[in-house]
Amino acid sequence: MEFSVKSGSPEKQRSACIVVGVFEPRRLSPIAEQLDKISDGYISALLRRGELEGKPGQTLLLHHVPNVLSERILLIGCGKERELDERQYKQVIQKTINTLNDTGSMEAVCFLTELHVKGRNNYWKVRQAVETAKETLYSFDQLKTNKSEPRRPLRKMVFNVPTRRELTSGERAIQHGLAIAAGIKAAKDLGNMPPNICNAAYLASQARQLADSYSKNVITRVIGEQQMKELGMHSYLAVGHGSQNESLMSVIEYKGNPSEDARPVVLVGKGLTFDSGGISIKPAEGMDEMKYDMCGAAAVYGVMRMVAELQLPINVIGVLAGCENMPGGRAYRPGDVLTTMSGQTVEVLNTDAEGRLVLCDVLTYVERFEPEAVIDVATLTGACVIALGHHITGLMSNHNPLAHELISASEQAGDRAWRLPLGDEFQEQLESNFADIANIGGRPGGAITAGCFLSRFTRKYNWAHLDIAGTAWRSGKAKGATGRPVALLSQFLLNRAGFNGEE
């Protein structure tokens, strides 16, 4: 689908369709008023007859409106004007895209980007429109034999901005929005792929393909089990012992700043391509969704794609920690004591708390990069779902400025995160009689104790942990990966690169 931006008056548009907003109760937006004026009150007369109230999501498609050059006008309800916020704006865009796609409008000029959204500028409105459009049209049908497509799908969308002065920021918004949307799609595709296809080797192949596609700035190295053993990554290796699939750690290095003093931001993604729970096996119901336990790695991959596409002037390293947790004769057991790469020992009390055992060794491994910051992304705990539900990602950090940066980026991107505490009182729950640390700390504060566990391996750098167990995928009829937190991390890195979205 093609996107562009322009500045023009609605009466001069020759298009298959013009999209304008209507507020409750039957109040025309400024652009709709202009169209009403040139059509001699045609639109307002329809509203007076009760054809459209203006409630969020209501639509009315008009054909051959008098004196209007475009073939059709799509009126879309936006709710009460003063209550149009970020969430409602995106819902209106989503409804618009679905309506245009379902009614055979192959191209359209959208004036919704001129609506006033509280606290948001034109760059944000255009970028979110692009991201939302791509999200709305996403489908995962690679493995279906019968693929359904609209007969006349939407192919071209033009977003209007109020003045020519805003064209540059609008074009930049489209560029950024497309790159982020492509990163989200890549993450969703990886997450939705079945575990018999998407294993650690598949993740590694995707990482290598990324380096091939962006060879100017990207290098990928894949570290196998033998090299991990030599590095002392025994905790990581133990998790994969029960699987016939080799554990592989893919390291994607992007260099956008040639300065020798430029330290990288490191992103670490948990890549459990299937998590049965191991010997502490999970219930059968819903176990199919444990293919999504690699969504942290998928998100990191998507972000690295975005960074490479936009050629951001920063250095970023993404690590995909690929592994599979299966029961078997070689599987690790409750009661085992593992020696981590850091030298600390861990008593395994539950083999289904495996993500932290993989991540702790990777967090030690990345010390060699002397990072400016390290952010790990993991579907780590069911406790985080209980705490924050399916709408907000859990955030923990050992560095207040980094935590504040991430929270700010989450608000900018509409991909929200909420900070949870780390404290010595929680660390006490991880005490073990037989090792330096236990891999679980009981039910109370389970998301926090998982973060506390990881924090013991991050003392040499600024670190943040994103628990995406509640936000990485949806269950039920709309089952599928969400691509979160690609938008959050993309915004964080855009901010670091100097593109903070301010006009």
UniProtKB/Swiss-Prot annotation:
Sequence positions that bind Mn(2+) 2: K270, D275, D293, E354
Localization of this protein: Cytoplasm
EC number(s) given by UniProt: 3.4.11.1, 3.4.11.10
Cofactor(s) required for function per UniProt: Mn(2+)
Group of enzyme by EC: hydrolase
Positions of the catalytic residues: K282, R356
Family: Belongs to the peptidase M17 family.
Protein name: Probable cytosol aminopeptidase
Gene name of the encoded protein: pepA
